[in-house]
Amino acid sequence: MPSRLSFHKYQGLGNDFILVDNRHQPQPCLTPEEAVALCNRRFGVGADGVIFLLPGQEGADFSMRLFNSDGSEAEMCGNGIRCLARFLQDLGIPGQDGAYQIHTLAGRIVPQVRPDGLVTVDMGIPRLLAGQIPTTLAKPEEKVVRQPLQVGGREWAVTAVSMGNPHCVVFLEEGGSLEELDLERVGPLFEHHPAFPERTNTEFAQVLGPNYLRLRVWERGAGVTLACGTGACAALVAAVLEERAEPQATVELPGGNLEIRWDPDTQHVWMTGPALPVFSGTTAE
């Protein structure tokens, strides 16, 4: 584990991150292997990932990089970027009306810290074509909506969405139970399915009303997490595509609720939720 590293622990609905102020150099100051050690919940600090605050690129105020707890790199993270915005505010960097232009591997994302402490994020326009996700479940120029997929000895109907990172959304029909779902078993099978060449996040959802979804998530590179911001966005988009929900809904996750809206005019997806500091520290020599 890296020695004498100053860090700050934040969480968004229980999805927890180690934040590192990396503005002094354009590349992360840790290797993926060091991030894995730092994320270890018994021998390290413990987290779902390490987020680096980097100098801005391409006209953005700042840049964000994220190593998952397995050492892989995520293009974007909804809960993570809310935590980054709160971290910037706590550093005394106010932003423009609380908003920050953040360069990510998924493009520019704009989180805004509201007066009530919640963070609203313009997550951009979802990518719906198979070639954009990417997945081989359809031709590259086609959408993937309610496509059959064989996983774990049974057939699932899946809808694929990219929020800058790949998502596979499965709606449990009547009689299905999120509580009874063996997520530890089936999650890795979805993540590593050959239909997703870059692996995938997977959301298992129930629609409790036109404006209310429940969700459990298997995150690519992190496993079971209490919440996933991009996953909540992808689930709402998938619910609208499958005509199960309206384009604005509360998404309930094990760690709490997010408010998600898919604007029918601009096609942008907006996410609102909390981000809170947990503690700050320095690793030992």
Swiss-Prot record:
Residues annotated as signal peptide: none
Name of protein: Diaminopimelate epimerase
Keyword hit for DNA damage: no
Enzyme class: isomerase
Swiss-Prot/TrEMBL catalytic activity: (2S,6S)-2,6-diaminopimelate = meso-2,6-diaminopimelate
Name of the gene encoding the protein in the UniProt record: dapF
Keyword Cytoplasm: yes
Pathway(s) it belongs to: Amino-acid biosynthesis; L-lysine biosynthesis via DAP pathway; DL-2,6-diaminopimelate from LL-2,6-diaminopimelate: step 1/1
